[in-house]
């Protein structure tokens, strides 16, 4: 039963992403659809239209894999190495700094969420 609940919760989170992508496509927004879906989910959770317990188990399992979601964006930059170094290395430094800040902030928020739950 636990696995079914986990699959349903992750599936519903994915549906929010799909709805956001659909809204982005219909209205031709420059904001990513997955971000729109997260904003919709945030609004529904913060107004208590949807209870947090409906997503808690699935979100906990996804947070465990959060660092793995950051790896493709970082390794994808290797394709543009010549471009990054051609602009007097300022772009390279900005990319490295933003990656480090993203890792630190996401790690801090993950730890904060884990400790506040306990």
Curated annotation (Swiss-Prot):
Domain of life of the source: Bacteria
Predominant location: membrane
Annotated transmembrane regions: 4-26, 33-52, 62-84, 91-113
Gene Ontology cellular-component terms listed: plasma membrane
Subcellular location: Cell membrane
Entry keyword set: Cell membrane, Cytolysis, Membrane, Transmembrane, Transmembrane helix
Membrane topology listed for this record: Multi-pass membrane protein
GO biological process: cytolysis; killing of cells of another organism; programmed cell death
Pfam family, one: LrgA
Family: Belongs to the CidA/LrgA family. CidA subfamily.
Record's function text: Increases the activity of extracellular murein hydrolases possibly by mediating their export via hole formation. Inhibited by the antiholin-like proteins LrgAB. In an unstressed cell, the LrgAB products probably inhibit the function of the CidA protein. When a cell is stressed by the addition of antibiotics or by other factors in the environment, CidA possibly oligomerizes within the bacterial cell membrane, creating lesions that disrupt the proton motive force, which in turn results in loss of cell viability.
Protein name: Holin-like protein CidA 2
């Amino acid at each position: 039963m636990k696995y079914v609940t986990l699959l349903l919760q992750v599936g519903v989170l994915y549906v929010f992403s799909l709805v956001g992508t659909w809204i982005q496509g219909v209205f031709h927004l420059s904001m990513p659809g997955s971000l729109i879906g997260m904003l919709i989910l945030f609004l529904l959770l913060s107004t208590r239209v949807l209870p947090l317990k409906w997503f808690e188990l699935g979100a906990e399992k996804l947070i465990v894999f959060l660092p793995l979601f950051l790896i493709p964006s970082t390794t994808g930059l290797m394709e543009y190495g010549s471009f990054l170094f051609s602009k007097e290395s300022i772009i390279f430094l900005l990319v490295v700094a933003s990656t480090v800040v993203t890792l630190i902030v996401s790690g801090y928020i993950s730890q904060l969420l884990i400790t506040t739950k306990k």
